[in-house]
């Protein structure tokens, strides 16, 4: 098994549950790391490959739902909740905040394995998206200051002549910058560049000339 093989992170204060879940998941070829508390989990090194978090709701140091809230916004593994005291409000809250599933003990092996598979697939997809975004940011970092001025103008729909006038450049010079922007951003077309700008959340620059003429 490779070091970057999928791993399931179990957080449950019951050692019998941790052992049973570990045996089941390992029998299906998955790596497992088990923790008795949220604090133990928080102190561990983050996984380097696809992962999911099997999280008990009732923990000795913090409620699992509270931990989910604390992790919000961070690049944490997708969560599958497990609990012996499930209720509708808790399950709705968990799913609303991004949990893949909410399983009430005792749950069947098939239900658990299906939830884990879905969570691992989600994490694999999210990791790929983050890697793509990181590469895109790296390409954007290669643009010169002038090219960063040109990019929002051309994705806003301005013609070369209009964008050139906006920046006080000749149209020929603007076209050179435009070609460089497309090449450095790895965009085969203007549509590709627009999508890249949207992913990078680059604000569209509206022509000051247009505003004066309006």
Residue ranges and their predicted role:
Residues 34-52:
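Acidic, metal-coordinating helix/loop segments flanking the phosphotransfer/catalytic sites
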Residues 36-37, 63-66:
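Acidic catalytic/metal-coordinating carboxylates
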Residues 87-89, 103, 107-117, 162, ...:
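C-terminal output helix
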Residues 159-192:
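Recognition helix of helix-turn-helix DNA-binding domains
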Residues 182-214:
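Basic, Lys/Arg-enriched C-terminal extension of HTH/homeodomain DNA-binding domains
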């Amino acid at each position: 098994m490779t070091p970057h093989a999928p791993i399931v992170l179990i957080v449950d204060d019951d050692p019998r549950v941790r052992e049973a879940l570990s045996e089941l998941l390992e029998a299906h070829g998955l790596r497992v790391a088990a923790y008795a508390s949220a604090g133990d989990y928080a102190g561990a090194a983050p996984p380097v490959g696809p992962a999911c978090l099997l999280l008990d709701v009732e923990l000795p140091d913090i409620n699992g739902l509270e931990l989910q809230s604390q992790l919000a916004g961070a690049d944490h593994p997708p969560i599958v909740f497990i609990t012996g005291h499930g209720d509708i409000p808790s399950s709705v809250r968990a799913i609303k905040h991004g949990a893949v599933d909410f399983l009430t003990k005792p749950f069947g092996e098939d239900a658990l394995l299906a939830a884990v598979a879905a969570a691992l697939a989600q994490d694999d997809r999210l990791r790929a998206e983050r890697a793509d975004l990181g590469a895109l940011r790296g390409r954007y970092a290669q643009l010169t200051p002038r090219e960063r001025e040109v990019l929002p103008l051309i994705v806003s729909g301005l013609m070369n002549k209009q964008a050139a006038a906006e920046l006080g450049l000749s149209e020929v010079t603007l076209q050179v910058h435009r070609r460089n922007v497309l090449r450095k951003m790895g965009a085969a077309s203007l549509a590709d560049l627009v999508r890249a700008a949207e992913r990078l959340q680059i604000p569209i620059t509206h022509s000051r000339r247009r505003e004066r003429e309006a």
